[in-house]
């Protein structure tokens, strides 16, 4: 689960992470009032969407204009900047061409920036460690730094069993070229950030940029926090921070039915049981010249109702031109899948090609249900056959 910058900063501040003063606003008038509460004379107005690259982005109705992060020198300028953003669609590298509608802005005090750095914490699942990453290339996308200047990314690993120690921050600080005063502030910042990361069950905490001020202070100029969805049951208070308007409606609907769904950019909808088989299915679709429209794992204990819901979610994507159902029935019974597919196809008046490959428990019963349904369902014998048939059917229907 992702949250907005202002929410992330409020949480991190409660654990001792240094952030600038700021207030959220939903209107231009509220933004001006927020500015009056700050020291000035410089203010920063930031669009609040679940995506990075806001400053370098552009608004759909003004592609040549200013981005989603703007400087202002008076409450009146703050109000004008906020009104120019609110209700408009901001397009960044991370939003894709569709962009995101700005529904709130964050008004923050200006800052005397001497240096811009990068700092993040994430989980290394392969090694069961928490990795702290830092770089002198603050303000840039870390993926771009990793590609062009991998030597500029510093890493230290922390064993969760023993926790963070002073040498972790010192090693990074020396690598970043911090002086003694800055090192002390940096160590305090890293320790507070680690404490928040562990206590809140985060998947990632990213500060980009982390700035060193003229006075030697270390402050989070931006903040991104993402939580481990599997741990949210331990944090009911964090659920209140969810902004469903920033999430894919299809993914929200899938979550209600305990389905693992991720929207992609292709045209072939996929419904599979098991994450590994789902990824293999997406790979073979690409092998035969098409692109998957989604990742969808119905799980091992799916019911007819869940399968029907999964089918509807796939078809709610206007980019879907065909559907491939690939089921290996171990715990999952093929007849249950078949009943769900038939029920959903009838309910939504299926208008795109559908290929179904079934194997495993009750496979013959499942095939009988499909063949007797009277629906134009294309049967496949194996994964390669299924991928070839759905790609061919989509091309023929085009």
Curated annotation (Swiss-Prot):
Q: Name one Pfam family in it.
A: ATP-grasp_2
The UniProt record gives the binding positions of substrate as 273, 330-332
- Which InterPro entries does the protein's record reference? ATP-grasp (IPR011761), ATP-grasp_succ-CoA_synth-type (IPR013650), ATP_grasp_subdomain_1 (IPR013815), Succ-CoA_synthase_bsu_CS (IPR017866), SUCC_ACL_C (IPR005811), Succ_CoA_ligase-like_bsu (IPR005809), Succinyl-CoA_synth-like (IPR016102)
Extract the coiled-coil ranges from the record. none
Keyword set, alphabetical order: ATP-binding, Ligase, Magnesium, Metal-binding, Nucleotide-binding, Tricarboxylic acid cycle
Q: Name one GO molecular function term.
A: ATP binding
Pathway of this protein? Carbohydrate metabolism; tricarboxylic acid cycle; succinate from succinyl-CoA (ligase route): step 1/1
Swiss-Prot/TrEMBL cofactor(s): Mg(2+)
Q: Which residues of this UniProt protein bind ATP?
A: 46, 53-55, 108, 111, 116
Q: Which domain of life is it from?
A: Bacteria
- Chain sites annotated for binding Mg(2+): 208, 222
The kind of enzyme this is, by top-level EC class, is: ligase
Q: Where is the ATP-grasp domain?
A: 9-253
Catalytic activity reported = succinate + ATP + CoA = succinyl-CoA + ADP + phosphate; GTP + succinate + CoA = succinyl-CoA + GDP + phosphate
Protein family according to the UniProt entry: Belongs to the succinate/malate CoA ligase beta subunit family.
User: What's the subunit arrangement here?
Assistant: Heterotetramer of two alpha and two beta subunits.
> Cross-referenced PANTHER family, in alphabetical order?
SUCCINATE--COA LIGASE [GDP-FORMING] SUBUNIT BETA, MITOCHONDRIAL (PTHR11815:SF10), SUCCINYL-COA SYNTHETASE BETA CHAIN (PTHR11815)
**Role this protein plays:** Succinyl-CoA synthetase functions in the citric acid cycle (TCA), coupling the hydrolysis of succinyl-CoA to the synthesis of either ATP or GTP and thus represents the only step of substrate-level phosphorylation in the TCA. The beta subunit provides nucleotide specificity of the enzyme and binds the substrate succinate, while the binding sites for coenzyme A and phosphate are found in the alpha subunit.
**The name this protein goes by in its record:** Succinate--CoA ligase [ADP-forming] subunit beta
């Amino acid at each position: 689960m992702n949250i907005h910058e202002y929410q992330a900063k409020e949480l991190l501040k409660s654990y001792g992470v240094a952030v600038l003063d700021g207030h959220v606003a939903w209107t231009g008038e509220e933004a001006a009032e927020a500015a009056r509460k700050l020291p000035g004379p410089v203010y920063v107005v930031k669009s609040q969407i679940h995506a990075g690259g806001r400053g370098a982005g552009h608004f759909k109705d003004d592609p040549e204009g200013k981005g989603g992060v703007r400087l202002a020198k008076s409450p009146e300028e703050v109000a004008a900047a906020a009104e120019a953003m609110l209700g408009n669609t901001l397009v960044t590298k991370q939003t894709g061409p569709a962009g995101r509608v700005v529904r709130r802005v964050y008004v923050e005090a200006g800052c005397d920036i001497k240096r811009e750095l990068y700092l993040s914490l994430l989980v290394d699942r392969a090694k069961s460690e928490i990795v702290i990453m830092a770089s002198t290339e603050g303000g840039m996308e870390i993926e771009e730094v990793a590609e062009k200047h991998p030597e500029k990314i510093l890493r230290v690993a922390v064993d969760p069993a023993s926790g963070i120690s002073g040498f972790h921050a010192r090693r990074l600080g020396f690598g970043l070229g911090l002086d003694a005063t800055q090192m002390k502030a940096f160590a305090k910042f890293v320790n507070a950030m680690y404490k928040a990361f562990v206590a809140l069950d985060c998947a990632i905490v990213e500060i980009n940029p982390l700035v060193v001020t003229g006075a030697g202070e270390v402050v989070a100029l931006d903040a991104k926090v993402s939580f481990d969805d599997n741990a949210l049951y331990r944090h009911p208070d964090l659920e209140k921070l969810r902004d469903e308007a920033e999430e894919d409606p299809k993914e929200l609907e899938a979550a209600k039915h305990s389905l693992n769904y991720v929207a992609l950019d292709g045209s072939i909808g996929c419904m599979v049981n098991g994450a590994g088989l789902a990824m293999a299915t997406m790979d073979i679709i690409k092998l035969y010249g098409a692109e998957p429209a989604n990742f969808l794992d119905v799980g091992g204990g799916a019911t007819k109702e869940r399968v029907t819901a999964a089918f509807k979610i796939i078809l709610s994507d206007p980019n879907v031109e065909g559907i491939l159902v690939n089921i290996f029935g171990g715990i999952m019974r093929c007849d249950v899948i078949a009943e769900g597919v038939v029920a959903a196809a009838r309910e939504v008046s299926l208008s795109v090609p559908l290929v179904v490959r079934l194997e495993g428990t009750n496979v013959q019963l499942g095939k009988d249900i499909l063949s007797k349904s009277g629906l134009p369902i294309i049967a496949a014998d194996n994964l390669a056959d299924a991928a070839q048939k759905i790609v061919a059917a989509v091309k023929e229907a085009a």
